Amino acid sequence: MKQSADLKRLLTSIDHKSYPAYKDVRGAYDFNTYILSIDHVQGDPFASPSKVSIQVRHAKAGFPAELFDTPWKKTALEDYLLRCFSREIGRLSFKAKGSGKSGLIATSHPGQEVLSRTACEIGRNEITARFEVGFPAFGRTINSGELIRIFFDFLPGCVENVFFYRRQNTAEIKKRITLADDQQFIRNELKRLDLVSFVADGSILPRETGVSDRPMKGSVAFHSPDSLRITLNLPGHGPISGMAIHRGITLIVGGGYHGKST
């Protein structure tokens, strides 16, 4: 495999050449603690950004296996790492200058849902993160010095801060994993009790608008009717009460954006 120094030499050699010369840098490069893969190079600085990925082997990342030894914990950790990585690279986007999308650094930006995403995947041997980089140019003339800044000055710190356990907020990670375990416990209880849904007391259901994930300001917290209230004893959180919706036809009424579908 080619080394990071090979990438720097190649980028230096194509500086001020026509933009298609960037395609010569496609491939994987060893940065010692992680592998940088340039998977697709954009056609010009105004086209969709280039596709890039990094891989960090578990032996170097150091995340304990018990943090991702079930599908739901794995998804929770992937989601957390992706959110961290999105914030890290977002601070550096467009710090490198040029025309069009030059200097853009971005990845998937999750909403409130915790879902399995290809932007960050924990595999058998490594963690992979996929993102986009706008390869810098002035007009259609390569400005490889700015791409060297991205790959050698900006990116290593982002990877170190996010994908190495020793640099992470371990208490926050533990909280996310405990929440994932509690959520899975509730899902299992729904099946066991023949329920289709559970709405916890204290939930804030109304949204700002029909296209917003943010809670409505000044909204009233949900309070279950006594006739429908049950209590579940979660392994992490402990007892939690709320409304159980049994299998069958249930009619829910209310004003617009008041949380009926939430």
Residue ranges and their predicted role:
Residues 143, 209-211, 256:
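A short secondary-structure junction signal
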Residues 205-241:
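N-terminal pre-Walker A segment at the start of P-loop NTPase domains
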Residues 123, 130, 234, 239, ...:
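Histidine-centered divalent-metal-coordination microenvironment in nucleic-acid enzymes
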Residues 132-134, 199-201, 246, 253-255:
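Generic beta-strand/beta-sheet core signal
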Residues 240-262:
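Glycine-rich phosphate-binding P-loop
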Residues 191-195, 201, 262:
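Carboxylate/His-rich catalytic cores and anion/metal-binding grooves
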Residues 52, 129, 195-196, 230, ...:
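A broad, low-specificity signal marking well-ordered, structured residues that form hydrophobic/aromatic
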Residues 1-194, 205:
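N-terminal accessory targeting/assembly segments
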